[in-house]
Swiss-Prot record:
Tissue: Preferentially expressed in rosette leaves. Detected mainly in the vascular tissues and guard cells. Mostly detected at reproductive stages in young anthers, in mature pollens and during pollen germination on the pistil. Also expressed in developing seeds.
GO cellular component, one term: late endosome membrane
Organism: Arabidopsis thaliana (Mouse-ear cress)
Homology family: Belongs to the multi antimicrobial extrusion (MATE) (TC 2.A.66.1) family.
GO term, biological process aspect, one: response to abscisic acid
PANTHER family hit by this protein: MULTIDRUG RESISTANCE PROTEIN (PTHR11206)
Factors inducing expression: By abscisic acid.
Domain of life: Eukaryota
Protein name stated in the entry: Protein DETOXIFICATION 50
Location relative to the cell: Cell membrane; Late endosome membrane
UniProt entry tagged with the keyword Cell membrane: yes
Main localization category: membrane
């Protein structure tokens, strides 16, 4: 009998322990799976949004091509300068608004979310004034840069008729942030789909029926964006569930807001975010300029344009994931849940690695066919096929790097991202690419190897910043960030510590 008990103890207890371990592993897996589902629920409608906007740009490009080579070249030149001088600024500045709104929503400070969105709209409207002046004088600037007169004239017309779009974008970016930080991305996606479907008939009416040419293409983009703004306003005003605001927040907002300090808080996040975005966007434009100095500049520039089309398509996916991770991290830090914020960051980075391998496989698989969608020139097709595997390796690093940016944005540390991008793209990427292309004779391939070096540097920096994050400290900073400043408040030192910590971490 004693032997039977001993056998039973020796056998049964380990089985119970194994069962307990399995339950624990199952519980951990379930928690991480639920987090992945939460991130994907935010991100997948954003993927749909991005794809429809991508198709919309193709529609405009097709109409430009139908107007002749000079109009196509002029419109493409205008789009490049619009990205460099306008849209990159708007996108970057909005990231600062997103950092505040995501944490404020997590802290249930809904009035503060609305106030931050309003400040974001004002900031972008003010920014649009110097951009407008720049666009109105773009023909002179292009001629100074030794561009062809005809191309400069076409680009100037396109930009001149695109000026109202700056107003639309000033409302559109903050409204997207407002919905995204509440995880309401499906309504945003539906509104974008409707506006995108209307874009084709609007463009046809303005270009083909009214015969406005390049003016009509520019105006169709303006009308489509104003339609999207109108749809978002209609949803927010009539269909959105109204956010309940607690009384303590009402009193604080009504009696003690220090607008100067709040603007300083916003600008401390918006300006570094803007620098970070612009550094990355501008790097690709510099690569196009460098292509003009290669042995076959025409084929190199054309191939670079085709490759940027595929990187833009692939970028929709990590960018959408990044926005989802940013929202989850910001919401959890705002609600004082540092462990959950850390979990969201880990799960997001895990998803981004899987996405990176998918992007790599896609770019390699289409290396011999992608250029056929744009040209039948053998030399351009050869250059594109040669570079696409390197582009795939770039995307392998770009996916976790972009998601890392989302983690930094959700934890309101944009200065770290700006520093990493500055070093990666301008101290590593462009110099390495230029040396390989011109000094060692790698040519077009060398430029993309430089971009690969930049992405490797970037992903190492982002991973290091994420791994070194003190999540408890970030939760404390979130409390400071999402608290409206009292008139005569005594916690100025805490705010200064928070701002300094955005760089020191």
């Amino acid at each position: 009998m004693s032997q039977s008990n001993r056998v039973r103890d020796e056998v049964t207890l380990p089985l119970l322990q194994k069962t307990s371990h399995l339950k624990n592993h199952s519980s951990v897996l379930s928690v991480f799976l639920n987090e992945a589902i939460s991130i994907c629920k935010i991100s997948y409608p954003l993927v749909l949004t991005g794809l429809f906007l991508y198709v919309r740009s193709f529609v405009s490009l097709s109409f430009l091509g139908g107007l002749g080579d000079a109009t196509l070249a002029g419109g493409s030149l205008a789009a490049a300068f619009a990205n460099i001088t306008g849209y990159s600024l708007f996108s970057g500045l909005t990231m600062g608004v997103e950092s505040i709104c995501s944490q404020a929503f997590g802290a249930r400070r809904y009035n503060y979310v609305c106030a931050s969105v309003k400040r974001g709209i004002i900031l972008l409207l003010v920014t649009s004034l110097p951009v407008t002046l720049l666009w109105m004088n773009m023909e002179k600037i292009l001629l100074i840069l030794k561009q062809d007169k005809k191309l400069a004239s076409e680009a100037h017309i396109f930009l001149l008729y695109s000026v109202p779009d700056l107003v639309a974008q000033s409302f559109l970016h903050p409204l997207r942030v407002y919905l995204r930080t509440q995880s309401k991305t499906l309504p945003l996606s539906i509104c974008t789909v409707i506006a995108s479907f209307l874009h084709l008939p609007i463009t046809f009416f303005l270009v083909s029926y009214l015969g406005l040419g390049i003016k009509g293409i520019a105006l169709s983009g303006v009308v489509s964006n104003f339609n999207l703004v109108a749809f978002l306003f209609l949803y927010i005003c009539f269909f959105e569930d109204k956010l309940s605001v607690n009384e303590d927040e009402k009193i604080t907002e009504e009696t003690c807001e220090d607008s100067v300090r709040e603007w300083k808080k916003l600008l401390c996040l918006a300006i570094p975010s803007c620098i970070s975005v612009c550094l990355e966007w501008w790097c690709y434009e510099i690569m196009i300029l460098l292509c003009g100095f290669l042995l076959d500049p025409k084929a190199s520039v054309a191939s670079m344009g085709i490759l940027i089309q595929i990187t833009s398509l692939v970028y929709i996916f990590p960018h959408s994931l990044s926005l989802g991770v940013s929202t989850r991290v910001g919401n959890e830090l705002g609600s004082n849940q540092p462990k959950r914020a850390r979990r969201a960051a880990i799960v997001g980075l895990g998803l981004s690695i899987a996405l990176g391998f998918t992007a790599f496989a896609f770019t390699v698989s289409v290396r011999n066919t992608w250029a056929m969608f744009f040209t039948d020139d053998k030399e351009i097709m050869k250059l594109t096929a040669m570079a696409l595997p390197i582009v795939g390796l770039c995307e392998l690093g770009n996916c976790p790097q972009t998601t890392g940016c989302g983690v930094l944005r959700g934890s309101a540390r944009p200065k770290i991202g700006a520093n990493i991008n500055g070093v990666a793209f301008y101290a590593v990427g462009i110099p390495v690419g230029a040396v390989l292309a011109f000094w060692f004779g790698f040519g077009f391939k060398g430029l993309w190897l430089g971009m690969l070096a930049a992405q490797i540097t970037c992903v190492i920096g982002m991973m290091a910043a994420t791994c070194r994050t003190d999540w408890e400290l970030e939760a404390e900073r979130a409390k400071v960030l999402t608290t409206a400043v009292d008139c005569g408040s005594s916690d100025d030192d805490a705010k200064e510590d928070m701002e300094a910590g955005m760089v020191d971490k």
